[in-house]
A protein has these predicted regions:
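Short coil-to-beta-strand transition motifs
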Residues: 90, 112-117, 149-150
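Hydrophobic beta-strand signal
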Residues: 95-96, 109
């Protein structure tokens, strides 16, 4: 996919390359038996609960909720604090879809000169592409023809433990 000038984003589907570079990668596996858990229709308020609302709306399978295209999905563990503003914390599990187009505003898993990162793909005010850190303590990565950039996929969900 070309984003202007001669900067091209290349998608790579070889997850072994991620693992070889010390990135924790988890392949999605389709299980023959879905685990369906109850989803209650009651909204959770930060005030007083209403006991009259205690009924199950439907059952929910987290695979169906979090994974749209199983064959194109993988998981990776976040490291560092550059994406705190996007709700991505150290050790969070990121759900990544390789089939989604990496467009302006999407959070992506990218390799820049062989180093892996998670950042927001954006055009800056000058119209140049950057990988934006969602933490002011970290600089953006200015993309140019001298950088080798490989987009591995778009982050669709974050699994975060409290």
């Amino acid at each position: 996919m070309s984003l202007g000038l001669s900067l091209h984003f290349k998608f790579d589907s070889n997850l072994a390359n991620l693992s070889d570079c010390g990135v924790d990668v988890f392949n999605y596996q389709i299980y023959s038996k879905a685990i369906k858990l109850p989803l209650y229709a009651t909204k959770v308020a930060a005030g007083f609960a209403s006991p009259a609302d205690d009924y199950v709306e439907k059952v929910l399978d987290l695979n169906e909720l979090l994974i749209q295209k199983p064959a194109a999905t993988f998981f990776v563990r976040a490291q560092g604090t550059s994406m705190l503003g996007a709700g991505i914390h150290p050790n969070d599990i990121l759900v990544v879809d390789k089939s989604i187009e990496a467009i302006d505003g999407k959070v992506v898993i990218a390799a820049v000169n062989g180093e892996f990162t998670v950042k927001r793909l954006m055009k800056n005010s000058d119209g140049c592409w950057i990988l934006h850190a969602e933490n002011p303590e970290f600089p953006d990565i200015q993309l140019n023809d001298e950088l080798e950039l490989v987009i591995w996929g778009v982050v669709t969900n974050v699994i975060h433990q409290l």
